[in-house]
Amino acid sequence: MSTPNVTARVETWLSSTWHVKVPLTWLEACINWIQEENGGGNLSQAQISRQVFEQWLLTDLRDLEYPILPDGILDAPKGELSGFYSLQIDSLLDVSQPAYSQLQKIRGKSTVNEEVTANTQAFQKPWEAKPTRMLMLQLTDGIHQIQGMEYQPVPVLHSNLPPGTKITVHGNVAYRLGVLLLKPENVKLLGGEVDALLEEYSQERVLARLLGEAENPDSVRQPGHEQIVPGPVDELGQTLGPSDEELLASLDENNDFILNNETSLESGYCSRSNNFSATSCSLTTYNENTTGFPLQQESVNLLPRSDEQTPPSVEYNDAFLNDFPLEDDILLEEEIQRELEEVPSVARNGNVNLSTERIPHTYRSSCGSSLNETSEKDDGCGSEKPVEVTSKQKNLARTVSTGDGTSTGGSLQCNSVSQACSSAIVLLKNPHEERRNDLGPDESSCQSRHAPDSRQLNKDPVSSSKTDPEADQQAILCRPGNACDLDLDSPPFTYISLLLAKKPETITLVKVKCFIVTLTGNLTSSNGSWGIKAKVSDGSAYLEVDFADDILTSLIGFSVPEMHTLRKDPALQPKLKDGLERCQKQLIDLCCLMTIEFNPFQSKATVLILQDTDARHLEQLKKRLNK
């Protein structure tokens, strides 16, 4: 059989069977080499054709310099590719996973932290779509360099394919800006590899270049590269829920709307964070006989999340409130300084000792600091028992004690002691000192009620140029005040810590100035009423509360019966969504006066009324402070 006839038949076989096109000069040289390698023996046409195809699989298409892709494909912003194109994969990366964790895994380093992703978190619901693998391929036909994106999962592709693997792209393939959008029906894996590319385009080197790290000169072939024709690999499937129409039709009277705020540990109050869309509070609904399904495709953000990912929790320590801005601290310290100037000295025969343990540099006195106060005192001039002020904040311990001596010249005013206690709580001006304010017995003496000593507790001045009246008003409304002089009905508001300390035995109505720390329950619609549980704080303590139906109805814009009417009409469904988003926006920075009904029998508190602060409340607070 003559060589030209063999060459023509091999060319036809490659084109018809594998859709492979090669230059004639390379094909003739390849056939001659095969015949020489076999000692000039008589090989059948099928054997020659097969060996030529195997040599093509091991050849770098750049050496052939034979264009396959149409001219101008890289210049057109979009288009569609039709036909059969045999291309070479230089490299590929899984862009759905962090490049750093992939590189650490290849290098055999610990990737425990990197493996903690949204896919491994307990709060991910079974109906939520899981991350899908997306491979980005660097392709070439020997002349043109083009990218291929795994637009839909392609089972025949995987990240361990060796550089130089050949594939056939066929059918109608859309492309955008030089990127082929590959689907499973568009890709056929032929196999092969190119030894010269194994080192340059190894996974480790490609990832290192992507991260800007130094490449490892000793990088070797990755495990699995020996497989020329890989088998199918598992793909990450997506669990798709029912349509919006089916979900709305499944709602009944006892649906629970779940506000997934497990990852939200920070409210918008006293926070300058601009990342109000960080927390995804998915609005979902539960059916009586099934697990939950999403009510809407969109998620509703109810509370902004802190910049750091934090595990879900409903228990908080006081360190959480230390993240408030320094600007608020300065405003508070101005008011603290004014209070200290008004405090008369503690008139007693004995000594006043203030001992401060080493305070962490990161601690700042703020309106969010939560301190537990325990004090025992007499109304008259009898001896005062020690007053202890403790905090849950680690490394912070302060004891204020008045001596055991007896009075020699009159009685000691109760408010003097209480103001001294309140001052001692926040007298943390210089955290760098290990010990301070050690007053001897001669520094504080007992005087008559009508002739108080002019000496005051030793204190450091606090300087600030803040003179904004609105900021001063906010600072005054935020300060804890003198718990010893307050009652649960003191205008304009009282404090949660005082409510918890007094432990009322009957149902009590109190007014406090609070903000939402986090949502601890689900938005529910039961028996024709809205309901949601939350944890609120006024800076002195936390309190678990339920929000009344009237409040939620006003925030959402419609009642539960109206909601059932809206869901029946598809045209009114946007109104349902808008109402929930309206509720979200108002909850983000909710900080106002709350009238709370405290029920000691059920250990339950319910927010009945929301009220904004005004000038009248400020005047009431000033009068209370000036008493």
From Swiss-Prot:
Region feature Disordered, mapped onto this chain: 362-412, 432-472
Oligomeric and partner information: Component of the RMI complex, containing at least TOP3A, RMI1 and RMI2.
UniProt biased composition (Basic and acidic residues): 374-387
GO biological process, one term: resolution of meiotic recombination intermediates
Cellular location(s): Nucleus
Lineage summary: Eukaryota, Metazoa, Chordata, Craniata, Vertebrata
Biased composition (Polar residues): 363-373
Biased composition (Low complexity): 399-411
Function of the molecule: Essential component of the RMI complex, a complex that plays an important role in the processing of homologous recombination intermediates to limit DNA crossover formation in cells. Promotes TOP3A binding to double Holliday junctions (DHJ) and hence stimulates TOP3A-mediated dissolution. Required for BLM phosphorylation during mitosis. Within the BLM complex, required for BLM and TOP3A stability.
GO molecular function: nucleotide binding
UniProt source species: Gallus gallus
Classification via InterPro entries: RMI1_C, RMI1_N, RMI1_N_C_sf, RMI1_N_N_sf, RMI1_OB
Name of this chain's protein: RecQ-mediated genome instability protein 1
The family this protein is said to belong to: Belongs to the RMI1 family.
Pfam families cross-referenced by the UniProt entry: RMI1_C, RMI1_N_C, RMI1_N_N
Major localisation: nucleus
